[in-house]
Amino acid sequence: MREKHTILKTGLLLMGVMLALSTSAQKESIGEMFELAKMKSGMKNRRISSTDPTGGNRDHLEPFKPGEKRTIADIKGTGAINHIWITIAPPPNELSRNDIIIRMYWDGNEYPSVESPIGPFFGQGWDERYNYASLPLSVGPENGTGMSSYFTMPFEKGARVEIENQTGQTINAFYFYIDYLEMKQLPEDMGRFHAWYNHTLSEALPEGETEWALTGEQKPNTEEARNYVFIDTKGKGHFVGINYYVHSPTPMWYGEGDDMWFIDGEKSPSLIGTGTEDFFNTSWCPKEPFSHPHFGYPRVNNDVGWLGRTHVYRFFINDPIFFESAVKGTIETGHNNNLTLDLSTVAYWYQDAAVMLPEAPTKEQRKPKPFINHMDMHRWRDAWRKAKGNDPQLWGNE
């Protein structure tokens, strides 16, 4: 009898736990589409756009002169930007999006917490255009000219968005929407959005580019100091994504580099990856276009091996990387940083307060490198032939 009573009590306890969990799940989010049905209070939709104030159809800003900075949105009070759309003329092949800078300032700060060339921020590398689709960012038709962001960007004491024209040319037409929610107060625990562009031309090892041990011994990476840094900030927050733009001057695979994360002042990384393509949720040295809401390859090199430009992205929507006091995210440029790569990134994260970003690369520093072409390869072959004694029947793989 005592045993049956115990079983009954246990069964009732389990039923109670399951009922509590079920009730809790109903109160909490069941998914994004479920959230859409919930009624909201205390919010007003607001928009700033380039609409023609006369009611005409010239729905773009007056031309930006070379070197001009202009505030396109200066929002007072409390709220959250939840959508940005921009398109620009002339097109990217005539007016590089790599030299138009977008900055965002939160809560009356004099320093930006978002600073990036506008193309790389939205998902357009170099001076190119192509369609790109992810959950928080996209660049849509026609042929990669409609740039959109759906990142939530909260502010308590105002927000300001600034554009700077560093192209050396005139921006003839700049169209935009900035949609935001006006609120009396922000929900609890809302962080501030940050985005930082960085760039490097990495240096090969003194013994050369020894990837896959083809030209020399492949040594371990015992000193992470040479890793490329894509986020380096102090404070509490969480990392939510990266756009990664790599231009390789060699047909060799560029992606043996591992990601390494130093969280809250760690001397050694607590998170270490197994390869660049693995970090971006792919495998085996891919070079095929692919799009997923959280990761993808919108632009691949289409050349011999991995020579040329590749754009990869990953957003940590379900798996943010959290930090309490600091984070430094790095990645090798090839195994043990053995490769020369023209590499740039835009990192996206939230912090409990808007902070100042590291210094931004200059126009000259971020200037895209030219493509390696067939004539360059023939010069390589000529130097190789001479190094091999210039035998008249040298083929190329001796």
PLM features per residue range, with description:
Residues 2-12:
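Bacterial N-terminal signal peptides that target proteins for export
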Residues 10-20:
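Bacterial N-terminal signal peptides
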Residues 21-25:
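Sec/Tat signal peptide C-region and signal peptidase I cleavage site
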Residues 26-398:
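Beta-strand-centric surfaces of beta-sandwich/beta-rich domains
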